[in-house]
């Protein structure tokens, strides 16, 4: 009898380990790999060491969102990030995607344009970066706490140029499907190009892409529509961060912005909407705040993913309280390739080393974090 009780206890699943239907995808658990820039794609081409990195973090029926992947030459703002605008890049992604699928994982490619978060050294022919504005960013201390990132004042896109950028997102989505990805996540967060258009503290336009909330969100929604029409809405997700101030992109009414976006997204029947918690105002700073994603969660009619400083207890609570369908983990997944298993067993976690997040080493801090079985 004692053995039977033990066996029953073993099959009791925590909320994070319960199955979830995400549109046409059947997920076996709710622990999602968040998109994580690692700067190990030399020359903007995905590398063979990424095969092991993503394979290590793949589980049967688990959702992985790939690192931010640049859609065009003008979208670059960091060294050694992957792209998906050339045939060579598409081919380089294929074995990485295959490795995830071999483990039964579901893999989305996050498609990205940095906008003004760049300088002319990254841009084709040394041109100025592009944005919704011509106001530049102030220099920033990089994540290593030493180097200073300098940004070239951007060139304001003309109204007639914007459809070309929308088209670049569409083509990138098509390329991602050609590479074998199950879908794409449109990067509309963290002060990059789409977020620059959405946020009223950045967007100072007077055309149909600026001013009102509807106008500021027009660019994002045109991209959603173009990408959904190209690859099918059930293969499209979007990430937004209405409350964040990353890269000097804040909004005076983030609650209204977030609600407008999710209500507008409802008509597209996307795979999911992925939202960064209000408590994550900047990349590394988790703060106490009274703002909540609950109104957005209630307004959105599809699968709702939350991210931002979650741990096991916090993630389970979000699911129990119906504040989310899925929970995305970043830093904990970097240092714990078997994070879902550790959560399931309530096992101790490896500590992450922030110093190796953005180095170019193909092993250290990338594929060398130990699994549970190698620690016993």
From Swiss-Prot:
Its cofactor is FMN. SUPFAM superfamilies: FMN-linked oxidoreductases. The active site is at 192 (proton donor). FMN binds at residues 35-37, 68, 110, 239, 309, 330-331. Keywords: Cytoplasm, Fatty acid biosynthesis, Fatty acid metabolism, Flavoprotein, FMN, Lipid biosynthesis, Lipid metabolism, NADP, Oxidoreductase, Oxylipin biosynthesis. Induction: Seems to not be influenced by wounding. The keyword Lipid metabolism applies. Substrate binds at residues 143, 187-190, 279. It catalyses: (1S,2S)-OPC-8 + NADP(+) = (9S,13S,15Z)-12-oxophyto-10,15-dienoate + NADPH + H(+). Signal peptide: none annotated. The keyword Membrane does not apply. Its EC number is 1.3.1.42. Constitutively expressed in roots, leaves, cotyledons, cells culture and to a lower extent in flowers. InterPro entries: Aldolase_TIM (IPR013785), OxRdtase_FMN_N (IPR001155), Oye-like (IPR045247). Belongs to the NADH:flavin oxidoreductase/NADH oxidase family. Specifically cleaves olefinic bonds in alpha,beta-unsaturated carbonyls and may be involved in detoxification or modification of these reactive compounds. May be involved in the biosynthesis or metabolism of oxylipin signaling molecules. In vitro, reduces 9R,13R-12-oxophyodienoic acid (9R,13R-OPDA) to 9R,13R-OPC-8:0, but not 9S,13S-OPDA, the natural precursor of jasmonic acid. Also reduces N-ethylmaleimide and maleic acid. PANTHER family: NADH OXIDOREDUCTASE-RELATED (PTHR22893), NADPH DEHYDROGENASE 2-RELATED (PTHR22893:SF91). This is 12-oxophytodienoate reductase 1. The gene is OPR1.
């Amino acid at each position: 009898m004692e053995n039977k009780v033990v066996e029953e206890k073993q099959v009791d699943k925590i909320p994070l380990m319960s199955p979830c239907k995400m549109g046409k995808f059947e997920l076996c658990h709710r622990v999602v790999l968040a998109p994580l820039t690692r700067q190990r794609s030399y020359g903007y081409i995905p590398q063979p060491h990424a095969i092991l990195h993503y394979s290590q973090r793949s589980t049967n029926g688990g959702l992985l969102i790939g690192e931010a992947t640049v859609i065009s030459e003008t979208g670059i703002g960091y060294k050694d990030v992957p792209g998906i605008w050339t045939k060579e890049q598409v081919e380089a992604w294929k074995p990485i995607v295959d490795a995830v699928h071999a483990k039964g994982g579901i893999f989305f490619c996050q498609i990205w344009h940095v906008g003004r978060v760049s300088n002319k050294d990254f841009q084709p022919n040394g041109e100025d970066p592009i944005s919704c504005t011509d106001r530049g960013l102030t220099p920033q201390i990089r994540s290593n706490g030493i180097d200073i990132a300098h940004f070239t004042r951007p060139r304001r896109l003309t109204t007639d140029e914007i459809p070309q950028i929308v088209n670049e997102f569409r083509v990138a989505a098509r390329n991602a499907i050609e590479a074998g990805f199950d879908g794409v996540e449109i990067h509309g967060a963290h002060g990059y190009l789409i977020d620059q258009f959405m946020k009223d503290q950045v967007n100072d336009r007077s055309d149909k892409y600026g001013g009102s909330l509807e106008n500021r969100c027009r660019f994002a929604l045109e991209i959603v529509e173009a990408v959904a029409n190209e690859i099918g809405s059930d293969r499209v997700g979007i990430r937004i961060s209405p409350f964040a101030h990353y890269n000097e992109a804040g909004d005076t009414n983030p609650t209204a912005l977030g609600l407008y976006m999710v209500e507008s997204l409802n008509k597209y029947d996307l795979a999911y909407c992925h939202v960064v918690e209000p408590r994550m105002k900047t990349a590394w700073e988790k703060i106490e705040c009274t703002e909540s994603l609950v109104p957005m969660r209630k307004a959105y009619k599809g699968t709702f993913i939350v991210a931002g400083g979650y741990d096991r207890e916090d993630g389970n609570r979000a699911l129990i309280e119906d504040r989310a369908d899925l929970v995305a983990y970043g830093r904990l997944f970097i240092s714990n390739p078997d994070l879902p298993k550790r959560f399931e067993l309530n096992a101790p976690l490896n500590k992450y080393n922030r110093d190796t997040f953005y180095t170019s080493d193909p092993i250290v801090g990338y594929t060398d974090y130990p699994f549970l079985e190698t620690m016993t």
